[in-house]
Amino acid sequence: MAEAKDLFKEFKVQSVSEFFRRNAAMLGYTGKIRSLTTIIHEAVTNSLDACEEAGILPTIRVEIEELGKEHYKVIVEDNGPGIPEEYIPHVFGKMLAGTKAHRNIQSRGQQGIGISGAVMFAQITTGKPTRVITSTGGEIVEAWVKIDVQKNEGKIVKKVKHPNPKGWRGTRIEMEVKDVKYVRSRQGVYWYLKLTAIANPHAYIELVEPDGKLVVFPRSSEEIPKPPVEMKPHPKGVMVDDVYTMAHRSKRSSVKRFLVSEFSRISEKKIEELIKYVAAIRLLKSEQNEEIKEKLREKLINGDVDSVLRSFGRKWKKEVEKVAKIMEKPPEKLTWQEAEEIVEAFKLMKFLAPPTHGLRPIGEENIKRGLTGILKPEFVTAVTRSPKVYAGGIPFQVEVGLAYGGQISGSEILRYANRVPLLFDAGSCVITSAVRSIDWKRYKIDSFDSAPLVVLVNVISVHVPYTSTGKQSIADIEEIYNEIRLALMDAARKLALYLGGKYRRMYQIKRRKTLEKYLPEIARSLHILTGEPEEKIREYFLKLIESKIEVEEVESVEVEEAEA
């Protein structure tokens, strides 16, 4: 029988980088086409976020050069604010590091893995470092970065500085990758950038394909999106560990001040209510009679906390005083049990929904600009819903765009999360299920699959509930599903009005031509019978036809608008 110390000889601590090196598929590096698209996605989203935060209209150039079979050089350059020299190894070489992962803020990337994951993929497929050229407006820094996977640290293996007489500012990334493939498929780089351009009409994007062909996705809006605002966590959306960890990191003077200043919808008055609820929870736990306990708990759930407290006689005032003292002590001295009681009270209390001013949708006009500029449809409409919350306290917002006809040849569902295209895992995404659940025939689309219709859905949130770390599919959350359906139906009603008018006009044109076809014969016959000039008779009937068609047009529009 082996001894315990022998069993643990192979025990080893694995770094985050080492874990993802062995499990690159979790980051989206699975399949030759998808892996290349993932690299471009990580670099481009970084560029867009950086430009928007700095108030710069993004200009992004992507170059893909074929070096051999399934071997490419990838270059992504932007006109963003640049990266300070000391942050280069952290940005490109350290996993779970970034400017947004620790903040409650809407962003395209959330995990602090993105671009460092791309650097690691390049490194494990070619063994070569990633070349980074960047400037914040001063001298240009050229650095070659590798990841030390054992330590989860970026290492600059070579660095050169250059003068910058023209004041260039931005970042250029160059990396070699193998085991990838460039194709113009629905999951490839070209399609990804096309979809990115639709959702980001303020961006100018260039793509140089491996055959040297230059593709330009022009800017169709000069409006820079307002940067998202960091949002405080809502009491209904936190766990015990959140409260405990935040309290121990807080610099506030008391637990009360910590709760009021670092959570949304908690005021001084709410603290008084919280004290009562925590006291009531404690007293309920001391109640021996299960039947009485259940009745009192029912009252507490219904918000009658004062009645619950009074039912314990004189004891309740002492318990309230004890809890009030907890609120006055330093937050770093908050115990786990006390944090549990606070979160349990949060679940019973009623709060206003979290503020949603920090969410930044694309906007209806910009969706229409993006769809029109790239797809050239004959009709386009968009709907941005009011913000809502899921999981009790996480704000989100849904917007939808529909583009019909024109240069569109078939149906397409364009899925986005915080403006980022989701190209993979469509079958497990709530957007797909919501679009498929719509009865499109009600909106004059006989067959969704064969209709010249593009459906854009963008889900915005500080915490998009992805189904995996690959961030390509949104979980089937009931509140999100319902909001997508409502937005789709709203937009589809506008499309139905347009199609109704289009079909009606086609019918009226055909009808007019049929009637006009017989006018010469009618005019001749009436001329013989009445002696009136043929031209006068023809003009009379033309006016009569036009008048009749106009009346029918107005009546049909009124009926359709009432039905919509």
Swiss-Prot record:
The name this protein goes by in its record: Type 2 DNA topoisomerase 6 subunit B
Binding sites annotated in the UniProt record for ATP: N46, D78, T99, K100, G109, Q110, Q111, G112, I113, G114, I115, S116, K471
Keywords: ATP-binding, DNA-binding, Isomerase, Nucleotide-binding, Topoisomerase
UniProt keyword DNA-binding present: yes
UniProt record similarity statement: Belongs to the TOP6B family.
CDD domains assigned to the protein according to its UniProt record, in alphabetical order: HATPase_TopVIB-like, TopoIIB_Trans
SUPFAM superfamilies according to UniProt: ATPase domain of HSP90 chaperone/DNA topoisomerase II/histidine kinase, Ribosomal protein S5 domain 2-like
EC number(s) per entry: 5.6.2.2
The UniProt record lists the keyword DNA-binding: yes
Pfam families: HATPase_c, Topo-VIb_trans
UniProt catalytic activity: ATP-dependent breakage, passage and rejoining of double-stranded DNA
Record-level Gene Ontology MF annotations: ATP binding; DNA binding; DNA topoisomerase type II (double strand cut, ATP-hydrolyzing) activity
HAMAP family: Top6B
Role description: Relaxes both positive and negative superturns and exhibits a strong decatenase activity.
Assembly mode: Homodimer. Heterotetramer of two Top6A and two Top6B chains.
GO biological process: DNA topological change
